[in-house]
């Protein structure tokens, strides 16, 4: 129903929440949620910078992480901001290209991981539990994380259907994106991490390191496409959606002003690095 409302009438989640929370309530809640959501984009920028540094190292170019990590992270944010400033049409075509390319890369990555490490060894990996944590507590923490993940994305997912021209397009675009494409990439990342653990005994989060170790340095170029395009595109789409969320509560504020404020905010979080350091609590 939220998708149909957004497509047919242009009434997204935050507009029809005014009937429950009122204009001031929506303004406060949308701002708080967007301020929190932007922390994830600082993590994405940090992942972009670390992957680019690691990729450069694979080809013999050593970059000082203390200098280049914040520089490359802010570059990711700036490139994403340019996409967001381009408006819905630029975002539409950017995502059409990115999703197609990244799906192809994702399929290749999964095949390579299963080729490098037998499936039976991947599925045999047991979860690592803290000594003071029971299996039930571990499950509860995982469930809480999944609920938080779904909640944070739902605040954005129910805005994007406004870009669709038909109800059918809005419905299938939203359903396939969050029901098929996003879970596929989560699963692909999990397969890569488990395969890396089987080979090295260490859990790794950087796809550049995982691909280069599992499949050779040549395949690390796939991570350049995966990480660079994905995180820059994520910055652009995320900036657009979250700024539109805030604008739903404060319609008189300029969209471009919100995007530029978001750029400064996410860049500051990226340079600080605290969100990634305390990601579990975040």
Where would I find each of the regions flagged by the language model?
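Selective recognition of specific alpha-helical transmembrane segments in multi-pass small-molecule
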Residues: 1, 33-42, 101-113, 145, ...
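Juxtamembrane transmembrane-helix boundary signature
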Residues: 1-21, 30-45
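Hydrophobic transmembrane alpha-helices that form the core helical bundles
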Residues: 26-62, 228-248
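Transmembrane alpha-helical segments of multi-pass small-molecule transport proteins
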Residues: 30, 59-86, 100-111, 138-157, ...
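Membrane-water interface regions at transmembrane-helix termini and the short interhelical loops
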Residues: 3-4, 20, 28, 54-60, ...
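Transmembrane helix-loop junctions in multi-pass membrane proteins
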Residues: 6, 45-52, 81-90, 112-123, ...
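Hydrophobic, membrane-embedded alpha-helices of multi-pass small-molecule transporters
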Residues: 112-116, 128-194, 215-236
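Hydrophobic, small-residue-rich membrane helices and short re-entrant helix-turn-helix hairpins
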Residues: 86-99, 152-184, 202-208, 238-254
